[in-house]
Amino acid sequence: MPKITNNDVTLSDYRALAQFRYEVRRYFTLSDQAARTAGLHPGQYRFLLLLKGLPEGMEPTISNLAERLGLRHHSTVELVDRMEKRGLIYRERSERHRSFVFVRITPKGEGILRKLVASRKLELKKAGPILVKALNTLTKKQTR
């Protein structure tokens, strides 16, 4: 991979990075607003999305979820407790390893998540081309 030096940074790069950051921040702000409108705290929306979208083969344990969320174990347990009380998720013991507890999404949680993801996809259709253009500007090979 070629090394990029300070001399390789152009005005286009600054503009592209600024635009990229603006669009990403705007997307997350709108996502948080949509979550609140749906009756969720934004962190609960992120949790449901993470839970439903875990990589194949990754077990939905508190430890794995905490790591993926960037939270401490006890903070994740508190989040799971609150969401379980609302009927969005539930805990289930592993059949193979009885000491493992998995977190699962309920039909109620899945229904809310599905609506939110559908609206987020529509927003990405609008913002996507701008994000792609900015990424292309930032990642194109320097020709000198």
Residue ranges and their predicted role:
Residues 1-38, 86-88:
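N-terminal leader segment of winged-helix/HTH proteins
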